[in-house]
């Protein structure tokens, strides 16, 4: 019996040790995901699902000589597409003149995951390998980013096993319920850049404007500050500008944890108002009159209670300061 137990232990040792040695950590898998994005020529067809609505999209990437190009297009409804050529992003959206920003990033969480600062993100999220699965007919490894406090959504990513390319992204709430999803349905890894991306790289684009010059006002001290922010969030930008299509001037503040961006607007209340709340998938829009009789609007991919707590915490830094 003792000899049998020894043999079983030795067998288990030979089975388990190589598996542990070969299994990369969650952090290593996310690093591979970001390297893969910059390394491969590929086209990914995917859908964005939120509250029963499905939006088909296509994300493409290629390496052209010494340049790198990415293209994101929404395939239904009003035309929206975004072109990234090296560090310049061109925006093409229905109802707006096209424009190009230098030093910006493509909009949306899908693009944010591909370029996020992992070291910073790991300060407020714990990466965990949760297993293997299949997406779009391909084997994948699954990694979860669990928030270190319950004020934020968690994320689950599915990474194609051989390349590391991102194929699926889920946003989940504290209970694990799905809030929003990006799901790849077909991946094509190409031996060379597609003709489509080659032609886009040669297209005449709007003149690039540095992000710092895109605002009508320089970064300034608004005289307001949030008394509370979720773990990892810091103030990234502040300015004062008119709202698009109106003459109403608002104080603007953008906060971020390196993955999720939240916009905060403050303006003088023109009339008594009740609180307004709109939630679309992971995006919460909260509009309220705070204790200082100032209208506050918070917009971002955070749970409603978090948006409300941010809004309620805003306070003037000096008596008498109002938008």
Feature roles, as predicted:
Residues 1-9:
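Bacterial N-terminal signal peptides that target proteins for export
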Residues 16-18:
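N-terminal signal peptide c-region/cleavage motif recognized by signal peptidases
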Residues 22-97, 125-133, 139-142, 146-154, ...:
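N-terminal mature ectodomain segment of secretory-pathway/periplasmic proteins
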Residues 91-113:
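Acidic/charged, solvent-exposed loop-and-adjacent secondary-structure segments enriched in E/D, K/R, S/T
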Residues 136-205:
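Gly/Pro-enriched, hydrophobic low-complexity segments
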Residues 169, 292-301:
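Short, well-ordered beta-strand elements
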Residues 204-292, 304-305:
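Short, solvent-exposed recognition patches
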Residues 307-322:
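Short, low-complexity, Pro/Ser/Thr/Gly-rich segments in the mature regions of secreted, periplasmic
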């Amino acid at each position: 019996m003792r000899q049998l137990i020894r043999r079983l232990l030795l067998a288990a040792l030979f089975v388990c040790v190589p598996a542990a040695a070969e299994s990369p950590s969650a952090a290593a898998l996310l690093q591979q995901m970001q390297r893969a994005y910059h390394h491969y020529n590929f086209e990914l067809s995917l859908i964005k699902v939120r509250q029963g609505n499905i939006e088909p999209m296509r994300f493409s990437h290629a390496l052209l000589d010494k340049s790198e190009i990415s293209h994101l297009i929404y395939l239904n409804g009003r035309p929206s597409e975004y072109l990234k050529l090296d560090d310049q992003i061109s925006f093409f959206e229905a109802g707006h003149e096209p424009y190009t920003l230098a030093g910006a990033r493509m909009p949306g969480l899908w693009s944010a995951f591909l370029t996020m600062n992992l070291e910073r993100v790991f300060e407020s999220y714990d990466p965990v390998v949760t297993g293997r699965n299949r997406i779009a007919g391909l084997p994948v490894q699954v990694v979860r980013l669990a928030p270190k406090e319950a004020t934020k959504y968690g994320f689950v990513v599915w990474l194609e096993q051989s390349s590391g390319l991102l194929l699926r992204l889920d946003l989940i709430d504290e209970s694990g319920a799905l809030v929003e999803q990006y799901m790849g349905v077909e991946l094509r890894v190409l031996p060379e850049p597609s003709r489509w991306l080659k032609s886009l790289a040669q297209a005449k684009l709007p003149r690039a404007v540095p992000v710092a010059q895109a605002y009508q006002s320089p970064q300034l001290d608004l005289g307001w500050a949030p008394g509370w922010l979720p773990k990892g969030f810091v103030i990234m930008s502040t300015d004062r500008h008119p709202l698009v299509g109106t003459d109403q001037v608002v104080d603007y503040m953008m906060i971020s944890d390196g993955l999720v961006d939240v916009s905060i607007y403050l303006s003088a209340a023109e009339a008594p108002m009740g609180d307004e709340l709109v939630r679309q998938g992971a995006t919460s829009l909260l509009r309220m009159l705070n204790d200082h009789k100032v209208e506050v609007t918070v917009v971002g991919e955070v749970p409603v209670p978090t948006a409300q707590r941010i809004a309620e915490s805003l306070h003037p830094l000096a008596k008498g300061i109002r938008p």
